[in-house]
């Protein structure tokens, strides 16, 4: 139940990040917003994309953190036993986790750059080397799509670890049941052998006693 709540938090934060990225795409500074002075110095006013992009980055980072908490919980709470039971096949979850973190770094770098360009660029200062820069078409939208992709990979990784743990736990329970049955059968067999040996001993003693009595007669 606790993991379900964390999954819903990741989904909600990811959805907010996705929506704010697309909102920033429509609110970004356009070419016609650029102004020039008599010395051909450029000026770009700030746009709402700055605030929207900042909110998108914040939500995405929080979603990534919560998602990794779920992964850590699922991995840390795996069943450990005296016979050395542990989850060994984590290839797919590990690949998805690495993909998620690589995607996270790319998205944060792209959004951080786009957010920085969305601030006001004063005359004679610009954004870099006194030149003004604008965010290209589709940058915010693509970042939102990548954010959803990365969070999806992270969620699948956490779910896969959980499912793998449950599957191996079932296998261990079945193995224990088989071992108990085998042990019970061995004990019954030993008991039967003991009874058989005991019966044979009694028969042998009776035969000896009978033989002795006959000899005396």
Swiss-Prot record:
| Disulfide-linked positions | none
| Any single Pfam family the record assigns to this protein | DUF1218
A GO BP term here is: lignin metabolic process
Q: Which UniProt keywords apply?
A: Cell membrane, Glycoprotein, Lignin biosynthesis, Membrane, Signal, Transmembrane, Transmembrane helix
| Cytoplasmic side of membrane | 24-51, 116-137
As given in the record, the signal peptide range reads 1-23
Topology in membrane: Multi-pass membrane protein
Q: Where are the transmembrane segments?
A: 52-72, 95-115, 138-158
Which sites does the entry annotate for glycosylation? 197, 213
**Annotated GO CC locations:** membrane; plasma membrane
Localization annotation = Cell membrane
Q: Which residues lie on this side of the membrane: Extracellular?
A: 73-94, 159-217
Q: Describe the inactivation phenotype.
A: No visible phenotype. Double mutants lacking both MWL1 and MWL2 exhibit smaller rosettes with a decrease in rosette fresh weight and stem height associated with a reduction in total lignin content and an increase in syringyl/guaiacyl (S/G) monomer ratio.
Top-level taxon of origin: Eukaryota
Decide whether keyword Transmembrane is in the record: yes
Q: What family does the entry list?
A: Belongs to the DESIGUAL family.
Annotated function: Together with MWL1, contributes to secondary cell wall biology, specifically lignin biosynthesis.
How is this protein named in the record?
Protein MODIFYING WALL LIGNIN-2
Which organism does this sequence originate in? Arabidopsis thaliana
Q: Which gene encodes it?
A: MWL2
